C-alpha cells in the first residue's frame, strides 16, 4: 500500500486487509493526545480500521467494538508509547447533550486522555469536547460490494473553549 499523508487523503479499500493496512499507515503517524473520529454507516469498517491503528501503535488486547462498554483501553507494549482508548459512542447518539468527557471519566479509565490516542467510533460532533482538533476519517460502502472508500482530514474545532 502506498504512503499516505496524515494531513488529508482518500483511498479505495477493496478488501478488509486494505482497510486494516490503511489504519496501520495512519496509525504509525499518530501521537499521544491525538483524537481520531471514525464515521460511516453500520458495517462500513470503522472497527476494522481501528484494528489497523492498534497494529501500528503496538497495543495489547483484541480490538472489538466497545459499543456496550463505551470504551476500552489498549495499553502499549513498549515503554514511552501511548495507549489507545477505543471509544464507541453509538449508544449516546440519541443523547447529543451527553457529557462525553464526564462519561469517559465515570469509566475510571486507567489512562489519561492526553497521554493516549483516542479512536472514537460515531464521534462526529462529540470529539470537539476532547480536543481542539481531530482526525476525521470517513468510510463509505460501495453498494453490493466489499469495497470501501476512505477519506480523511484534520478538523479544527472553533467552538472549543
UniProtKB/Swiss-Prot annotation:
State where Mg(2+) binds: 47, 121
GO aspect biological process, one term: tRNA threonylcarbamoyladenosine modification
Q: Which Gene3D superfamilies match?
A: P-loop containing nucleotide triphosphate hydrolases
Give the transmembrane ranges: none
Question: What would be one Pfam family of this protein?
Answer: TsaE
Q: Which domain of life is it from?
A: Bacteria
Question: Metal-binding: is it a keyword of this entry?
Answer: yes
Q: Name one GO cellular component term.
A: cytoplasm
Question: Which residues does ATP bind?
Answer: 43-48
Which InterPro entries does the record cross-reference, listed alphabetically? P-loop_NTPase (IPR027417), T6A_TsaE (IPR003442)
Subcellular compartments: Cytoplasm
Q: Does the keyword Protease apply?
A: no
MF terms per GO, please?
ATP binding; metal ion binding
Query: Sorted alphabetically, which keywords does the UniProt record give?
Result: ATP-binding, Cytoplasm, Magnesium, Metal-binding, Nucleotide-binding, tRNA processing
Function, as annotated, reads: Required for the formation of a threonylcarbamoyl group on adenosine at position 37 (t(6)A37) in tRNAs that read codons beginning with adenine. Is involved in the transfer of the threonylcarbamoyl moiety of threonylcarbamoyl-AMP (TC-AMP) to the N6 group of A37, together with TsaD and TsaB. TsaE seems to play an indirect role in the t(6)A biosynthesis pathway, possibly in regulating the core enzymatic function of TsaD.
Protein family according to the UniProt entry: Belongs to the TsaE family.
Task: Indicate what this protein is called per its UniProt record.
Answer: tRNA threonylcarbamoyladenosine biosynthesis protein TsaE
